Every structure is written in structure tokens, then in C-alpha cells.
């Protein structure tokens, strides 16, 4: 909210997961129970509308699959040395999906707000990744 107050041209893009109601609710104002199903991406998405989400300042939501979130989280660690949580991989993948909306002169800030320490047994575990069919 503060950033938009300082510069109304700032765009805030939220990343959502399949199985969450945020994107559809943001676009239509409808809380659709049919959008809700289990997902493994922790830290994003909801099957409720929390009071701490101010939908009025979010310009759009982009959906990212659980598999893409997990793979991009691991890629952050491997390629960039960033030991991040699963929602961080989702944020990077979501940005890549939205890159067509960007101009060369745009400045992009991605918030990576979670450490990978809570995901050692999941995202950073090959057996878990294989059990979810995220790795072969």
C-alpha cells in the first residue's frame, strides 16, 4: 500500500497456486468453492479470504503449478545460491510467465520472503519430489 501511495504507477502482481481462490476472487469478486482443491505449494494461495490480504492494491494474480514452484525453488538454490522456500520459486516462475507484460525500461522487484530450511524434507528432497511426480 505504501509503495502505491508513493508512486501510483507501481504494479503489484500476486502469485497464486492452483487450488486457491485468490485469482478468481480478485478477477470476479466471487468466492468459488469449485476452485478449492489440495495443493502442495506452501506460503501462497488460500481456501479462505484472510483479512490481511488487501485485494484493492493487487493489480493481478498469476497462477503457478505446484511442480513449477518446486522446480524453480530448487533452481534458485542451484543456479543462484539462494536457499529459498517454495513460494519463492513460485514468484520467479510467475514473473517469467508474466514477462510479456513488461517493457525493457520496467524495474522489477521480487520479494523472496522465505528460507528453504523448512523445506529440506520436501522441495530439497528427491524422494519427496518423485513422490509428487515433480522429478522422474
Spans of model-derived segments:
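Short glycine/serine/threonine-rich phosphate/pyrophosphate-binding segments
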Residues: 1, 87-95
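Active-site/ligand-binding loops adjacent to catalytic centers
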Residues: 4-86, 123-136
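Phosphate-binding loop/pocket of nucleotide- and phosphate-handling active sites
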Residues: 38, 93-136
Amino acid at each position: 500500500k505504501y509503495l502505491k501511495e508513493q508512486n501510483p504507477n507501481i504494479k503489484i502482481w500476486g502469485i497464486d497456486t492452483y487450488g486457491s481462490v485468490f485469482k478468481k476472487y480478485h478477477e470476479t469478486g466471487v468466492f468459488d468453492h469449485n476452485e478449492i482443491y489440495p495443493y502442495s505449494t506452501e506460503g501462497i494461495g488460500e481456501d479462505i479470504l484472510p483479512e490481511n490480504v488487501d485485494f484493492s492494491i493487487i493489480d493481478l494474480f498469476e497462477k503457478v503449478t505446484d511442480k513449477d514452484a518446486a522446480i524453480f525453488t530448487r533452481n534458485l538454490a542451484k543456479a543462484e545460491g539462494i536457499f529459498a522456500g517454495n513460494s519463492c520459486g513460485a514468484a520467479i516462475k510467475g514473473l517469467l510467465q508474466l514477462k510479456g507484460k513488461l517493457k525493457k525500461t520496467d524495474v522489477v522487484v521480487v520479494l523472496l520472503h522465505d528460507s528453504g530450511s523448512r523445506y529440506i524434507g520436501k522441495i530439497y528432497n528427491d524422494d519427496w519430489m518423485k513422490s509428487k511426480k515433480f522429478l522422474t
